[in-house]
Amino acid sequence: MRSPVGNTYETIAFIACMGVLCALVVELFSKKGIVLAAGLLLGAFSCQMGILYESSQAVDHMDPLVAILRSNFLLSTHVITIVLGYAAGLLAAVLSHIYLLASPLRLIGGKTEQSLDRMAYGILCFSLVFTLVGTVFGGIWGNESWGRFWGWDPKENGALMIVLWQLTVLHARKAGWLSSWPVSYTHLTLPTTPYV
């Protein structure tokens, strides 16, 4: 059995699918329509990024994975969990961008603004849980595969950076430093996630 996320191209496609799926689940509860727009933007942007990446780099293929990456339940769980967390984080970032663009133009207000705030906050909490659990699974897998839980390589550092940033945003919100802005500073997460 092979994990559906074995290379960069597959990761981008998986993020697009999971981001849209997260948007659909949130839309079932909110029924505001704005989350569908955010999911559409995330899906379209991710697909476009995948097309551009594949056409410019053309380095990813559906080649068989190296032995250490094959048939490892913990690795598959780690990768799927952390990429789901990244997709949810990107969805929260897109919602925050919508808020930051629409609020000053008075396109949204009142209950829609509060609803958008709650949705971005909830999605960011969901993202944090999956990103944190995925990072820990990655450490456990690394310890079993290479004998070290944490090696400070770029992917590990990137995952840690995303977890710490999400924790910072959520704690700042809880402390009242972000008060009426929805977790609007999650938009800074957007540039960091694709590079992990």
Role assignments for model-derived ranges:
Residues 109-113:
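Membrane-interface interhelical connector segments
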Residues 63-76:
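Juxtamembrane membrane-water interface segments that cap and precede transmembrane helices
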